[in-house]
Amino acid sequence: MSRDPGSGGWEEAPRAAAALCTLYHEAGQRLRRLQDQLAARDALIARLRARLAALEGDAAPSLVDALLEQVARFREQLRRQEGGAAEAQMRQEIERLTERLEEKEREMQQLLSQPQHEREKEVVLLRRSMAEGERARAASDVLCRSLANETHQLRRTLTATAHMCQHLAKCLDERQHAQRNVGERSPDQSEHTDGHTSVQSVIEKLQEENRLLKQKVTHVEDLNAKWQRYNASRDEYVRGLHAQLRGLQIPHEPELMRKEISRLNRQLEEKINDCAEVKQELAASRTARDAALERVQMLEQQILAYKDDFMSERADRERAQSRIQELEEKVASLLHQVSWRQDSREPDAGRIHAGSKTAKYLAADALELMVPGGWRPGTGSQQPEPPAEGGHPGAAQRGQGDLQCPHCLQCFSDEQGEELLRHVAECCQ
């Protein structure tokens, strides 16, 4: 879709709006300066009136009053022009044109995004808006003409004021010359000289005001020129809109339309491919997240299982330790009992064997005494064996090993003490 028609109008619109805003700010600043100057001039006129009333001269009072009335009338006209309807109309016109510019931009964006059958409707609406713009331009032309008429009136008023000031200056010069001639014979020459000086100062002040008024007229002419330039820029913008409308009315070439359609189709395919890639990435991320959650749950379960195993092993170790302590206490008590019984039953044999036996042999004897007849609880099929001749009942078992488990009566050698303790801990559980 081509945007060449009316591109000049789009480029001119921001410049016109910027020029309009600049003009509005400059006009506001100059209005404030003019208001300050008017206030200073009012104070000056009041002082001049007071001095004229104090002088009470006879020379051309009607001219001074007429000049003051003319200045007051001119001040009122200038104040009405600058601070009244002209400023309000200009501000309203600026706001209205700014709003219309924004509306045109929005309408153009909508028009470019709409299909062909809706563009025709937009063309009709744009024609109507163009007619309204022409009516607004006519109204602005009327406003410009009114400003030009006021400018001409101000020029004529300034010219009349200048002539009146010149006439007043001539009259004052003649009076001053006459009073000089008469003052040589008058005793109160000093008082008349003061009066002439004050009148001369009044004339100078009026001439200064005349100069200021001329400057204000120049300022008004400058504003009028800026307003004309703004009208010219607005006309250019309107012509750009007309050209844009003509471009919209002309049907596009089929080749351009096909190119535009193919370009839009490519963009659509690219967007669809991007969406598919994003969906795949999203699915992959979701799968990875689910796998991570499952692994976390599995690890949590493993941690709980390891924790339970650790607690159970710890409880088993504590029970085994307590059981080992109990067995050690029982072994100590049995050793004590065995030694006492052997001393009481076989004093000679006990004394002979006591010197050669160790504490481990005594433990084995004590266990054999607790299980009489050679029967072991761990073997249900074993029959009780008769004791050997010439010895006591545990002699055969002691021949097989030095140490024996008190529960299952398994024998261990002297070097297998640690294995015996482990076996006792496992067997007694």
UniProtKB/Swiss-Prot annotation:
Organism: Homo sapiens
ZnF endpoints (CCHC NOA-type): 397-429
Positions of modified residues (Phosphoserine): S7
Tissue expression notes: Ubiquitously expressed in all tissues examined.
Keyword presence, Ribonucleoprotein: no
Pfam assignment, any one: EABR
Keywords: Apoptosis, Coiled coil, Cytoplasm, Host-virus interaction, Inflammatory response, Metal-binding, Nucleus, Phosphoprotein, Transcription, Transcription regulation, Ubl conjugation, Zinc, Zinc-finger
Keyword Glycoprotein tagged: no
PROSITE patterns, per the entry: ZF_CCHC_NOA
GO molecular function: K63-linked polyubiquitin modification-dependent protein binding; polyubiquitin modification-dependent protein binding; protein kinase binding; zinc ion binding
Result, substituting S62A: Reduces phosphorylation
Subunit note: Interacts with STK11/LKB1, TNFAIP3, IKBKG, NFKB1, MAP3K8, TEK, RIPK1, CHUK, IKBKB and SMARCD1. Interacts with polyubiquitin.
Function: Inhibits NF-kappa-B activation by blocking the interaction of RIPK1 with its downstream effector NEMO/IKBKG. Forms a ternary complex with NFKB1 and MAP3K8 but appears to function upstream of MAP3K8 in the TLR4 signaling pathway that regulates MAP3K8 activation. Involved in activation of the MEK/ERK signaling pathway during innate immune response; this function seems to be stimulus- and cell type specific. Required for stability of MAP3K8. Involved in regulation of apoptosis in endothelial cells; promotes TEK agonist-stimulated endothelial survival.
Annotated stretches, region: Ubiquitin-binding domain (UBD): 289-347
GO biological process: apoptotic process; CD40 signaling pathway; cellular response to lipopolysaccharide; inflammatory response; interleukin-1-mediated signaling pathway; negative regulation of canonical NF-kappaB signal transduction; negative regulation of endothelial cell apoptotic process; positive regulation of B cell activation
Biased composition (Basic and acidic residues): 177-195
Protein known as: TNFAIP3-interacting protein 2
Residue segments, region Disordered: 177-199, 372-400
Residues at which Zn(2+) binds: C405, C408, H423, C427
Modified how: In vitro phosphorylated by CHUK.
